[in-house]
Amino acid sequence: MIVIGIAGVVGVLVAMLSMSTGLNKTLTATGDPNRAIILRGGSNGELASFLDRSSSTLIKQDPAIARHPDGLPFASGELIVITEVPRKGQSSGANVSLRGVEPKGFDIRPELNILQGRKFKPGLRELMVGAGAYKQFDGLQVGSKLKFRGSYWDVVGVFETKDAHDSELWADLDTVQSAFGRSGMSSVVVRLNYSKAFDDLKRRLSADPQLTVDVKTEQDYFSSQSSSLSSQIGSLSNIVTCIM
């Protein structure tokens, strides 16, 4: 019995370390040197961050942000909420990130490819599903309906970015805010305008008395998320080792 118990603990430890390696690889592959992410000052991630609309509007006016020929900035206010979807082959559900994005959220991410279906339409309760989530969970096929907060959402597309966003569901920002009772957003993601744009952006936004924000390159942000995750899983692994 002791041998079986030890084998079980070792199996759990190996699984945890394997999961850590896989997640770290995904997170460190996420991000573009020409993009920056702006969070509320002191936040350790998008889930803990909150920016109101006035802050988002002010951020988007910075000249370091590239602009589309239509004159609008390449910037997307984005909101992360946690919801639940069915696991494949199981009756229980699992948490998944639902990201509300603005229309320019697609333009600033040229790596995003639509594998099936189409983009969601602003103002409608429509979802796009990341390729990773599509493989992992049930009920995410194009044409399916999911129920969040008492209302039904239509799955209209499957997308791939080959990074951490593949594990997410995407929808229109305003629609997500309305459905989940949120007045603001988690972050603003922007495409930079020139080679030293990040330094200028960070300097101006950090010095603006109307803002309390942290400004990071997208690569630095996801790298820090990877380091934090590694630390947490490492601590859990040490606890398991001590129990043995």
Regions found by a protein language model. Name each.
Residues 1-23, 230-244:
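Hydrophobic alpha-helical transmembrane segments of multi-pass inner-membrane transport and secretion
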Residues 7-11, 44, 134-135, 161, ...:
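Glycine-/small-residue-rich active-site loops that bind phosphorylated ligands and cofactors
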Residues 7-97, 116-118, 123, 178, ...:
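Hydrophobic, regular-secondary-structure patches
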Residues 37, 126-128, 187-189:
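Short aromatic/hydrophobic contact patches that present stacked aromatics
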Residues 47-51, 138, 193:
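Extracytoplasmic/periplasmic, Sec-exported soluble proteins
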